Structures are given as structure tokens and as C-alpha cells.
């Protein structure tokens, strides 16, 4: 099948086919996946290609959309407790390495990737406007800004014809607003007062109204607090799990007395290569034995049920009705309820709100107070003071040393 490309996509393909290091950035709907597929189609059969992503879930999605094998960066570079298998002294044997969701790259993982692919052409694909990684630095964003690596920016919105208010509001968030709300067109706002308990009540109401949507998820900035992820999961589990109730076997989780039981939606929180289930995969508990901590989880996207044989393995499972924004990078959901309240004021930023709303494919419900939204739209916190751009551009001031 011949893929139709716009001008920016054609330039990106040319860059990926020729540059030693290529950076491809664009928002949701700009055609990054189509551009990658077109590039892979253009490569000859003798070209050794490797695909990778920072997380297991992102790697699985990359494999699904390309029809090729993809792995985590840790697997690609052969990470062991003793270090990396592929390094600058013994790099990976590949002609081209493509890395998706590159905005998740911290400096440590990015440095390992650059060293371990020293023989290969490297293509980094992502969205420079998303949240910076949990780890130190914002490698992808700094490379985009530095001008020291060739960058292709995909600007055409290929989802605009769908009339998506998510796509319409995303660039508004990045420039500080204002955002548009249309309760009939997929972008709803529920304004509450300063009290965090009002947030919980509003989220509860929105979740009840959309309880028949299995793709519904609530996103909050942090785990802690009255309207954090842990507290919201305690509130939402009885609403969204029709099988919960008195007498049901459960496994306790964490200081907030979270529990998982049959019917509970859960998320895998670390890669388990033995069970072949990756960090970020979301499933439903279909069986549980509280006496030994074993469980069975059905993963619809994987098309299989995974048996967790012991409490040690099920310790990686957490309730997934509410998740942090960071935890959902690289994922999409039909309906997203976003908590944007001044209770989390120190964490609110444009990049966090942008990343949160762009997890939604169809509908966003924004819950919070006016102060919280104003704080998020005002705070351009993604611009971390990393100094990497200045280092790459050679503009760091010389240190003054007094003798």
C-alpha cells in the first residue's frame, strides 16, 4: 500500500534515510507513525534495522504499527546488573536504529543509547512538547532546540478533519491558552472550589457518568494528596469495578491501603520478561488467591491472560483507575478525566496539561479550580535548566577561577 505524505513528512523521510543522527518531532496527529512506516518501506532488504522505545508498552505499540519487531532500549543494548553489553567500545551491529517516544529519554539512558549505537545511524522520534522524563534532563527537547542535529518538524494536523477538540486545544495549552470548552464536542470542564474534596466528588461524578466506557482513565499529577492517584483509586474502584464488594478476596497495596480484587483494573509497574508483560500494560484481574498472592490478569491489548504465580510477581500490580500523567506517556485512551487543581500547584505546568489531554482520543473532562488551570497555563516548567543546549552550541560562559 502506498502511503500518502505531506511535504514535511517527505522531508522527514529524506532526513531519516540520510542523516547520521536525525530528530523527528511532532504533536499527536502529525503523522509520525506514517512517516516512520514510509521510511522503513524505503529501506532496502539488506539494511539491518532495529526498533526500540524507552518502555515496554511503547515498544509493543511500535511493533504493532510497523509490523516489525521492537524492544525496549534496555533490551536493545543488552542491559545487565553489571552494565551494558553494547557500549562505545563494542557497539550494536545495526545500520539504522529508530527510537520512538524519545521525549522519555533521560540523560543517562540517552548517553547509553548514543554510545551503544555508535556504528549506526540513529533516528529519534517524539514530541518535544511533552513532559520531560522522570530522570535527569530533557535530552530530546534539548537536541531539538540546540540546532546541532538535523530536525524535521511535522506540523500538519492529519486529525483535524475529525473535529477533535483535543487536537484543537493542545497547541493552545502550549502557548498559555485560553483553551476552548464545548461540552457537546468532546472537551468538558468541571470547575470546583479550593477544597480538594470537591475534586474527588467531581471526579466521582464524571466517572459514574462514563462508567460504561472501559477505556476511561483519570489522570492526576502525583500519587499523594487528597486528590492524588492513590486516594482517587480508593474512591473509583467501587464505582468502576462491578465485581467488587464485601467478601471479595483482595491483595493489599501500599500505605494508602489500596487493594486489588477480581474485576479490578490494574497496571503492571515494571518489566517482567519471564511473564512477558511490560511496564505500563493495563489489564483486568480475572482470578486471585489471597492465600498465596497469586493472580491471573487478562490483558486485552496483548490478547492473552497472564498468570502471576506468587505475591512477589503480583507486587508489580497496582490499581489503574487513576494514574499519574507520567505513567501514561506513550498511551492513548478514549476518555480521559484530567485533574488540574491548585492542590498540586507546584507540579502543574503546560507540558503536564498538554501531555495529559493528548492521551485522549475522543473526550477530555477537565476537573479543577480556576487557580490550578491558570497555574498550569502560566508555568512553562518543561524548560529545565539543563545547560545542554548551551554546551552543544558552545555558549556556556567560562568559569571564573580566583587564585
How would you describe each model-predicted region?
Residues 1, 11-15, 19-20, 129-275, ...:
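Conserved helicase motor core of P-loop NTPases
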Residues 5, 51, 98, 218, ...:
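Conserved SAM-binding loop
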Residues 8, 12, 35, 39, ...:
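Helical mechanochemical/support elements of P-loop NTPase systems and associated helical scaffolds
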Residues 18-23, 38, 42, 46, ...:
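Conserved helicase motor core of SF1/SF2 NTP-dependent helicases
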Residues 29:
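Walker A (P-loop) phosphate-binding loop of P-loop NTPases
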Residues 32:
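Conserved lysine of the Walker
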Residues 47-52, 68-76, 151-153, 239-252, ...:
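Conserved RecA-like helicase motor-core motifs
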Residues 175, 267-271, 275, 279-403:
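C-terminal accessory regions
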Amino acid at each position: 500500500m502506498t502511503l500518502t505524505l505531506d511535504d514535511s513528512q517527505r522531508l522527514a523521510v529524506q532526513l531519516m534515510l540520510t542523516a547520521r543522527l536525525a530528530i523527528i518531532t511532532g504533536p499527536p496527529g502529525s503523522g509520525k507513525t506514517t512517516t516512520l512506516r514510509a521510511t522503513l518501506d524505503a529501506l532496502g532488504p539488506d539494511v539491518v534495522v532495529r526498533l526500540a522505545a524507552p518502555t515496554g508498552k511503547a515498544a509493543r505499540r511500535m511493533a504493532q504499527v510497523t509490523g516489525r519487531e521492537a524492544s525496549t532500549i534496555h533490551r536493545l543494548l543488552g542491559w545487565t546488573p553489571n552494565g551494558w553489553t553494547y557500549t562505545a567500545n563494542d557497539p550494536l551491529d545495526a545500520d539504522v536504529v529508530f527510537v520512538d517516544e524519545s521525549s522519555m529519554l533521560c540523560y543517562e539512558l540517552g548517553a547509553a543509547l548514543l554510545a551503544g549505537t555508535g556504528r549506526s545511524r540513529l533516528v529519534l522520534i517524539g514530541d518535544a512538547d511533552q513532559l520531560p522524563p522522570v530522570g535527569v534532563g530533557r535530552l530530546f527537547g534539548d537536541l531539538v532546540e540546540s540546532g546541532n542535529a538535523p530536525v524535521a518538524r511535522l506540523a500538519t494536523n492529519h486529525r483535524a478533519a475529525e473535529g477533535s477538540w483535543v487536537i484543537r486545544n493542545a497547541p493552545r495549552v502550549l502557548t498559555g491558552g485560553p483553551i476552548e470548552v464545548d461540552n457537546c464536542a468532546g472537551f468538558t470542564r468541571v470547575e470546583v472550589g479550593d477544597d480538594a474534596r470537591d475534586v474527588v466528588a467531581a471526579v466521582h461524578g464524571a466517572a459514574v457518568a462514563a462508567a460504561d466506557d472501559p477505556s476511561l482513565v483519570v489522570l492526576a499529577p502525583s500519587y499523594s494528596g487528597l486528590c492524588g492517584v492513590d486516594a482517587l483509586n480508593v474512591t473509583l474502584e467501587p464505582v468502576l469495578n462491578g465485581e467488587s464488594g464485601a467478601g471479595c478476596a483482595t491483595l493489599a497495596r501500599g500505605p494508602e491501603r489500596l487493594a486489588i480484587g477480581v474485576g479490578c483494573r490494574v497496571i503492571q509497574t515494571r518489566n517482567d520478561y519471564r511473564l512477558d508483560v511490560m511496564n505500563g500494560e493495563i489489564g483486568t484481574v480475572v482470578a486471585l488467591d489471597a492465600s498465596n498472592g497469586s493472580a491471573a490478569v487478562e490483558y486485552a491489548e496483548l490478547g492473552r491472560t497472564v498468570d502471576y504465580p506468587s505475591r512477589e510477581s503480583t507486587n508489580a500490580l497496582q490499581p489503574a483507575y487513576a494514574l499519574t500523567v507520567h505513567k501514561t506517556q506513550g498511551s492513548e485512551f478514549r476518555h480521559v478525566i484530567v485533574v488540574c487543581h491548585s492542590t498540586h500547584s507546584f507540579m502543574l505546568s503546560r507540558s503536564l496539561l498538554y501531555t495529559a489531554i493528548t492521551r485522549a482520543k475522543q473526550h477530555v473532562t477537565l476537573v479543577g479550580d480556576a487557580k490550578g488551570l491558570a497555574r498550569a497555563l502560566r508555568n512553562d516548567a518543561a524548560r529545565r535548566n539543563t545547560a545542554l543546549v548551551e554546551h552543544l552550541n558552545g555558549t556556556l560562559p567560562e568559569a571564573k577561577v580566583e587564585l
